[in-house]
Amino acid sequence: MRLGFLSVLFGDRPLKDVLKLIKPLGLQAIELGCGNYPPDVHCKVNELLESKPKRDELKAMIKGEGMIISALSCHGNCLHPDEAFAKKNQQVQTNTVLLAEQLGVKVVCDFSGCPGADDESTKPNWVTCAWPPDYLEILEWQWEKKVIPYWTNQAKFAKDHGVNIA
């Protein structure tokens, strides 16, 4: 087992400096933030997707410090009831999976997401209780209409690209 860290904790520093800071601690792996809630300061997904030399440079920098990329992180809310917000998060997730494939990284970390209570919602609704029955109806709608269909498709997409979503 390797011990690692999430790069966004050091978002105020260049990646090269972060790696030099972390190396003496004995950590061997890095999870790179790729956008959505975690900033993409160390891993500009679109730039890396477009440039093999930039991907090679990133991998060499990390390998040069004796580390591996354990995962790419794009925690977001792809199920958000605000369609524009959800689509932006979905695009970051899709591109992160594609980048993981190109980098040879097998894991992309994400949030499951939280839809609204119904199609008219404008804010996510996290159901935390089973009573009164209205809440169970919301939960059933969320799972059957939003969560299961979305993640069934995304799991297949990730699998088709040799990536697991965690």
Stretch-by-stretch model annotation:
Residues 28, 59-64, 68:
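Radical SAM/AdoMet-radical enzyme domain recognition
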Residues 12-16, 51-56, 83, 94:
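Structural motif corresponding to alpha-helix initiation and N-cap regions
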Residues 6-10, 33-37, 74-77, 113-115, ...:
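Active-site beta-loop-alpha junctions enriched in small/polar residues
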Residues 16-38, 100-107:
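Catalytic domains of carbohydrate-active enzymes, especially glycoside hydrolases
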Residues 31, 71-73, 109, 166:
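Conserved beta-strand positions in the central sheet of alpha/beta enzyme cores
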Residues 17, 61-64, 78-166:
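Active-site acidic/histidine proton-transfer and metal-coordination neighborhood
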Residues 33-59, 112-119:
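Glycine-rich, proline-tolerant flexible connector loops at the mouths of alpha/beta enzymes
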